[in-house]
Swiss-Prot record:
Disulfide-linked positions: 37-68, 93-245, 101-111, 226-232
Positions annotated as glycosylated: 118, 137, 211
Reported uses of this protein in biotechnology and industry: Can be applied to high-throughput detection of single base mutation.
Known cofactor(s): Mn(2+); Ca(2+); Zn(2+)
Protein name: Endonuclease 2
Propeptide section residues: 283-290
Summary of the function given for this chain in its UniProt record: Endonuclease mostly active on RNA and ssDNA, and to a lower extent, on dsDNA. Can cleave mismatch regions in heteroduplex DNA containing single base pair mismatches or insertion/deletion bases. In contradiction with PubMed:22506810, cannot hydrolyze single-stranded DNA and does not cleave mismatches.
GO molecular function: double-stranded DNA endonuclease activity; endonuclease activity; metal ion binding; nucleic acid binding; RNA endonuclease activity; single-stranded DNA endodeoxyribonuclease activity; T/G mismatch-specific endonuclease activity
Record's signal peptide: 1-27
Amino acids binding substrate: 28-33, 72-76, 85-88, 94-99, 118, 136
Region (Substrate binding): 147-196
Amino acid sequence: MANQKGLHVVMMIITVWLLYAAPNIHGWGKEGHEIICKIAQTRLDETAAKAVKELLPESAEGDLSSLCLWADRVKFRYHWSSPLHYINTPDACSYQYNRDCKDESGEKGRCVAGAIYNYTTQLLSYKTAASSQSQYNLTEALLFVSHFMGDIHQPLHVSYASDKGGNTIEVHWYTRKANLHHIWDSNIIETAEADLYNSALEGMVDALKKNITTEWADQVKRWETCTKKTACPDIYASEGIQAACDWAYKGVTEGDTLEDEYFYSRLPIVYQRLAQGGVRLAATLNRIFG
């Protein structure tokens, strides 16, 4: 117990340093990742909830969502982790692990799907891990999984290499300059939060949780289903590239101004991907720790 308490103190110091020493650049954006982790934490069974609380540093005060951005911020110290946030595909609306899961040097497995496989497998050792070092790695593994499960559900994190996931497609979001990737990372969610929820993130979280038990209730079992003990990121990535083609890229050309028509037609897709990310993160942790 003393060793574990000491570990939590070390983790708190390291985590705080990493969080505040790095620039504020995010995946889904702060709100999107928080939403996914908030949804997930409410769906954890008792065993998984206990494991998550034990692995989180004391600074998190038991709140997984407070550290769901850790993986974004730490990549400026862990440079090797940058390619683990996305998948580059050909301009063909399809994803294949063996073809697409690699970094720019061609090293296989270095993409968000490969990272999810890796870190969920590490978490399987939680029950038998004894040393402080392995516990520290499992804390990082939990934070990586929680973040990457969000990234893989953002459609433009599984998208075309030719435009860097929409990052090179310059448009306007209403009156503001933006690129298409940033619109899906942040602008759609921020606009919804401001216009539909009085800038209250909890209102959006509550609405999504309600939809999970009502509007999407008949789909949740399918979202949770995975034949592996850990996660099924290839399914999530295949859905992602399809959503990118059908919704993110569709009808958009360089220099366009995207306004209400794009916002209201794409918002349901954003809502669904956030909900799927939260449901699947919880299901993954329940399988691993159960």
